[in-house]
Amino acid sequence: MSYIIKEIEEAWQIKENILHDSSKLIKLKKILNESIASLNQGIIRVCEKQGNQWKVNEWVKKAILLYFITTESQLYNNNYNSWYDKVAPKFPADTDKNIFKEAAIRKVPGAIVRTGTYIAKNVVIMPSFINIGAYIDEGTMIDTWATIGSCAQIGKNCHISGGAGIGGVLEPLQAKPVIIEDNCFVGARSEIAEGVIVEEGSVISMGVFIGSSTKIVYRDTGEIIYGRIPAYSVVVPGILPPPEVGKPGLYCVVIVKQVDKTTRGKVSINDLLR
């Protein structure tokens, strides 16, 4: 892997001219195809947890961006649609059923998954869109019309509900993607973007919008934080009162409670929201 990283870093330095050097281009394409295949298999990933911190592997982002630069668009078809793109589908129309059986995943009509995406065992993909570089861990459901952006990281046993959006990021290189840790629920039509981290066991109610500048308010203390939903939080949309009467209030999200693993195991997600 160190050889691949070295080659990608060197190619990145000359990316503006790489298309004009045919010998380097042929060599680079082979390396990039290996990198995309490794993303597909979960061997490498854009972001990974080391201890309690998430670390961005910038070279993987560079590999994806170089793949876009060096790949020409082509026509793709399945039984009911055609499209013209630089990125092939992860599951083309002629995918053998044994591939799905061995992977232990379920994918229904209308689900679009680009290559360079890792889909772990027992994942269910309803009609939705999952972009290149995304990582979907075991037992997660991507529900109808949800979108998973490029490089987004979704943990084990999560439920990304209907119409929810999980933002993606390829640039800037050092920026973290949106990260949804294990055992999280993201409610319908919610949007999590701009590198926000939703920590393990959290429940995001329907219609919650969280970006890097969104105020996240603890209801019991009034403390305000940004960019991170603490583990085992239950979050609903809210509004902060204006400083002066007659002025508009501002949108925020509210941590209404935090529960431990024991409590969460005894109640359903709907009970927690209520």
From Swiss-Prot:
A molecular function (GO) term: 2,3,4,5-tetrahydropyridine-2,6-dicarboxylate N-succinyltransferase activity
GO cellular component, one term: cytoplasm
Catalysed conversion reaction: (S)-2,3,4,5-tetrahydrodipicolinate + succinyl-CoA + H2O = (S)-2-succinylamino-6-oxoheptanedioate + CoA
Domain of life: Bacteria
Annotated substrate binding sites: R106, D143
Pathway: Amino-acid biosynthesis; L-lysine biosynthesis via DAP pathway; LL-2,6-diaminopimelate from (S)-tetrahydrodipicolinate (succinylase route): step 1/3
EC number(s) from the headed UniProt entry: 2.3.1.117
Keyword set, alphabetical order: Acyltransferase, Amino-acid biosynthesis, Cytoplasm, Diaminopimelate biosynthesis, Lysine biosynthesis, Repeat, Transferase
Tagged with keyword Acetylation: no
Family: Belongs to the transferase hexapeptide repeat family.
PANTHER family according to UniProt: 2,3,4,5-TETRAHYDROPYRIDINE-2,6-DICARBOXYLATE N-ACETYLTRANSFERASE, ACETYLTRANSFERASE
Record HAMAP family: DapD (MF_00811)
Subunit structure: Homotrimer.
Protein name: 2,3,4,5-tetrahydropyridine-2,6-dicarboxylate N-succinyltransferase
Organism: Rickettsia prowazekii (strain Madrid E)
